[in-house]
């Protein structure tokens, strides 16, 4: 008995040793064969043996854990004839099968066949899946096409065309004059102011005329032309500032040595006045900022003009609509009073049907004919009863009582 018990224990120990060697070989091969972007640590935990009372089965369990899910579950089942080691791994990995026999006690004679699962390195497509969604390509995939589509839209072209038209219109409307002389240009850098005679045949005298710049209605600089200066037809005259370092060439070019630069800000208005102070030409510069502001206002105006027809119905039409609705409400009762009042009057005149309790046959006298039991009663009795009932129901007129003296007289006669 002792020998028989020692033999299965020796076989179990040999199986455990072989299992540990196989697992060590698997771990080494996994360390050599695994090529992953991040390290994954695995540990093998051994659980105590479980004795089966019925078949004397020894089940040593071992389980390997990784970062995400268990790689394998090993179970050894030993019986009297044979013992099998099976492993259940991941779905993608192949199962490892190791078979041993109790008849051969030596480890050399035992036949083992095992297939160790190896982790294959990730392909380039898998690596791309990790990096997809980051970087410039992802941004361009989201917004690149939209930029291409919106780069040359008709709306942008319309805006640019509208801006150029605004600049042209603003240039015409900001430079105004009462006569032939106009202020054609005020240099943005403030180096000069140019006047032009728009007449094709007429010469204009500008001697002693005053060129001034006003800010908020107050003159900040004044320049007076010399005497006897005549501006030829379709000709220009330029007044240079000292910062321009230009040379005076009358009657076409003049230098204002006391003024380093002209003002070119939008809040400054350049005015040409007669010697008596009467303004004959004025100019207000325009910049990109003002142009964009005007463009925005024009766009808003266009939007409002598009919405105005419907907005008028809502903003202005609601007053008339409310007035008309109130009028209709006032008129409707007047028009509909006949149709609404008459049914009410008819309903008041209608008398609802009422059930009188005295009409019920059960509520009448049983001697009367309509009563259900009237046939059981003698007709003679019924006639008597009816006559007596009628006499009882008929009101008897009250006769005045005669005087006793009158009765006696009648009796004697």
Swiss-Prot record:
Keyword tRNA-binding attributed: no
Residue ranges of the region described as Disordered: 1-25, 102-128, 356-413
Any GO BP: cell population proliferation
Annotated ranges, domain LTD: 169-287
Low complexity composition bias: residue spans: 385-396
Residue stretches of biased makeup (Polar residues): 107-128
Keywords tagged on the record: Intermediate filament
The keyword Signal appears for this protein: no
One cellular component (GO) term of this entry: nuclear envelope
Similarity field: Belongs to the intermediate filament family.
Protein name: Lamin tail domain-containing protein 1
Protein species of origin: Mus musculus
């Amino acid at each position: 008995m002792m020998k028989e018990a020692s033999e299965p224990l020796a076989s179990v120990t040999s199986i455990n040793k072989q299992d540990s060697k196989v697992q060590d070989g698997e771990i080494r091969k996994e360390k050599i064969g695994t090529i992953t972007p991040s390290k994954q640590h695995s540990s093998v935990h051994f659980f105590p043996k479980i004795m089966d009372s019925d078949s004397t089965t020894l089940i040593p369990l071992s389980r390997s854990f990784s970062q995400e899910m268990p790689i394998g579950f090993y179970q050894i089942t030993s019986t009297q004839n044979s013992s099998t080691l099976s492993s259940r791994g991941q779905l993608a990995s192949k199962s490892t099968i190791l078979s041993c026999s109790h008849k051969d006690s030596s480890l050399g004679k035992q036949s083992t066949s095992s297939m160790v699962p190896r982790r294959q390195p990730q392909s380039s497509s898998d690596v791309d899946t990790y990096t997809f969604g980051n970087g410039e390509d992802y941004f361009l995939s989201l917004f690149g096409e939209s930029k291409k589509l919106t780069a040359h839209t008709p709306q942008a072209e319309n805006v640019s065309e509208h801006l150029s038209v605004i600049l042209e219109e603003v240039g015409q409307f900001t430079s105004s004059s009462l006569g032939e002389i106009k202020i054609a240009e005020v240099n943005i850098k403030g180096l000069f102011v140019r006047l032009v005679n728009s007449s094709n045949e007429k010469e204009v005298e500008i001697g002693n005329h005053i060129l001034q710049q006003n800010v908020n209605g107050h003159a900040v600089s004044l320049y007076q032309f010399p005497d006897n200066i005549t501006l030829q037809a379709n000709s220009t005259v330029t007044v240079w500032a000292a910062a321009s370092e230009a040379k005076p060439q009358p009657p076409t070019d003049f230098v204002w040595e006391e003024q380093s630069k002209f003002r070119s800000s939008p809040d400054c208005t350049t005015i040409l006045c007669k010697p008596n102070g009467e303004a004959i030409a004025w100019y207000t510069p325009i910049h990109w900022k003002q142009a964009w502001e005007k463009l925005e206002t024009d766009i808003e105006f266009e939007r409002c003009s598009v919405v105005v027809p419907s907005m008028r119905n809502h903003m202005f039409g609601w007053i008339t609509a409310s007035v008309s609705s109130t009028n209709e409400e006032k008129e409707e009762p007047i028009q509909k009073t006949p149709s609404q009042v008459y049914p009410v009057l008819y309903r008041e005149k209608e008398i609802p049907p009422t059930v009188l309790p005295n009409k019920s046959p059960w509520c009448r006298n049983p001697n009367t004919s309509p009563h259900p039991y009237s046939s059981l009663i003698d007709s003679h009795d019924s006639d008597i009863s009816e006559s007596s009932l009628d006499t009882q129901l008929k009101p008897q007129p009250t006769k005045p009582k005669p005087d006793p003296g009158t009765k006696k007289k009648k009796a004697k006669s």
